A protein has these predicted regions:
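C-terminal nucleotide
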Residues: 3-7, 11, 18, 26-27, ...
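Short glycine/proline-enriched turns and hinge-like loops at secondary-structure junctions
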Residues: 29, 124-126, 162
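DPxDG-like acidic metal-binding loop motif
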Residues: 121-143
Length: 313
């Protein structure tokens, strides 16, 4: 039996612009997903994916020699159907095999189980943790596997592989990962609130590209400023200055993607600062506040609220 574990992810700075070289601050979470592989006699891959509660949400059987789907079961009303997920999984396995032809080269088969430690709709990296663990199993580069089978910046792979916050940047089409120390003195005033509106990363990237074409004239200046804000996140000593950085960051991204910042859109009467994390419009937001913060958001109908220490690895 082999066990592979990958951390979940949150992108604190540089959403969208990380794709064009901005230095971004990413943090691994205490939540993640493991992948357990056992050898079996049948020449098949028997796959089972389990939620954080232990419920099986996806099952599939693949013919090992031909790498073809035999059958699948999808026990969820979210995000597509079983065959789509099975084909996506098959694409990842096939790409890993192209990268390492000895992967899955066996007369015997495999029983594979994946186990999430967070709800699937949290957006902490159900796909990225899977890709990173498959890459470890196949002994291939996880960033290349991501880029060959999906799209995305790769910051989530950096989080999957590191147990500390990282600066993540794409330079000359290659990932540059630098572990950093991000331990703000005001972390007691930081919260993560889930908006319960799962965002599609591919769709978010596509929309960003559309808007980017219209904003090319000053995009390099904005990338430079976002990189500076990422640096400033590590050095800022007061909550007030941190909030000012959040507001500026939100304004810069808003000017590019032509969407209202989340505070302006949903919480204009909130007393603290709010920052979108990743694709705007869903999943978690970073919130500054105090002891009254959980009550405010619960009264608005947002009940999944985690303190900084509960989320960050």
């Amino acid at each position: 039996m082999k066990n592979y574990y990958s951390n979940g992810k949150l992108l604190l700075t540089g959403e969208y612009l990380v794709l064009d070289g901005a230095k971004s601050l990413a943090i691994p979470t205490k939540f993640g997903q493991d992948l357990v592989v056992e050898n079996i006699q049948e020449p098949q891959i028997i796959w089972g994916s389990f939620t954080h509660t232990g419920a099986c949400w996806f099952e599939a059987v693949f013919d090992l020699q031909k790498l073809r789907l035999v059958n699948c079961t999808f026990n969820s009303d979210r995000e597509g159907n079983g065959e789509v997920i099975a084909e996506t999984l098959l694409d990842i396995l096939e790409e890993a095999k192209k990268m390492n032809p000895s992967f899955l080269k066996s007369e015997n088969g495999f029983m594979v189980k994946t186990n999430l430690t967070f709800p699937r709709n949290w957006g902490l990296g159900t796909s990225s943790t899977l890709i990173n663990s498959i890459a470890a199993w196949a002994k291939v580069d996880a960033f290349k596997l991501l880029w060959n089978s999906f799209k995305g910046s790769g910051y989530d792979i950096a989080c999957a592989q590191n147990d500390t916050p990282v600066f993540y940047q794409i330079e000359n089409k290659k990932p540059v990962v630098a572990p950093v120390k991000f331990n703000p003195s005001f972390k007691e005033n930081l919260f993560f609130v889930h908006l319960n509106q799962k965002q599609d990363s591919k769709e978010g990237i596509a929309k960003f590209r559309e808007h980017l074409d219209c904003a090319r004239h000053d995009i390099q200046q904005k990338i430079k400023r976002i990189s500076e804000i990422s640096d400033a996140f590590l050095k800022v000593e007061s909550l007030e200055k941190f909030e000012a950085l959040i507001v500026e960051h939100e304004q810069i991204i808003s000017s590019i993607i032509k969407l209202k910042p989340v505070k302006e859109k949903l919480f204009p009467d909130y007393f603290g600062a709010i920052k979108s994390l990743g694709a705007w419009g869903g999943d978690f937001v970073l919130v500054t506040g105090n002891a009254d913060t959980p009550t405010y958001f619960k009264n608005k109908g947002f009940t999944t609220i985690l303190r900084y220490q509960e989320m960050v690895l």
